[in-house]
Regions:
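Alpha-helical scaffold/interaction cores of sigma-54-like transcription cofactors
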Residues: 1-194
């Protein structure tokens, strides 16, 4: 099956504005609400209380119930960790998520988020890999928000994404018949404070 350009991206998370606060939630169509069927739990309980059921069957059913409860708990823990990570990203990039201006992205690496949430860097990497977030200004890939920092002429640390954006703007505005040389690009970016 070939890729179709008009395929929609279904986000994993949603960021919304509530006054000055940014709210983060899971996109519920992507996550199932899991629970153990109440009538099945009652059947297991009744079987455990029954003297007519052999010990091996009772143990088997108890083990299956415990496994199901563990699975539901693990999924809830995973969702909780995912939300903590994305909330930390939104907090670190508050201005960007509020305004949607790429120039407001601050340098941020996986380690920053991992330390803030209290998880391993690999956990943050797995949570943000191939995950999308819907924002008031569009849907974006979470990993694209992570950038290294570069110190500009004023001594401020800025995101390398800001510099990439500035280069793209300069190249878009140049005469395509006579593109800028590398030295000219450096001079133009230097004039802009980079």
């Amino acid at each position: 099956e070939s890729f179709q350009a008009n395929q929609q991206i279904m986000p994993d998370f949603i960021v919304t504005m509530d006054g000055d606060e940014l709210e983060v939630s899971l996109y519920r169509q992507r996550s199932a609400t899991l629970h153990i069927n109440q009538s099945w739990m009652e059947s297991v309980k009744n079987t455990e209380e029954s003297t007519q059921t052999d010990k091996a069957t009772r143990q088997y059913l108890r083990n299956k119930l415990n496994a199901a409860q563990w699975f539901v708990s693990a999924i809830k823990q995973r969702e909780s960790t995912m939300l903590k990570v994305v909330r930390a990203i939104v907090k670190l990039q508050y201005d960007y998520f509020r305004e949607g201006d790429i120039k407001l992205i601050k340098p941020m690496i996986l380690k920053n988020v991992a330390e803030m949430v209290g998880v391993d860097i690999s956990t943050v990497s797995r949570i943000t890999c191939n995950k999308y977030v819907s924002t008031p200004f569009g849907t974006l890939l979470l990993k694209d928000i992570f950038t290294e920092g570069i110190i500009n002429q004023q001594g401020e640390t800025i995101s390398n994404r800001v510099i990439q954006n500035a280069i793209e703007e300069v190249i878009e505005s140049e005469d395509k018949q006579k593109p800028y040389t590398d030295q000219q690009l450096v001079a133009i970016l230097s004039e802009k404070g980079f």
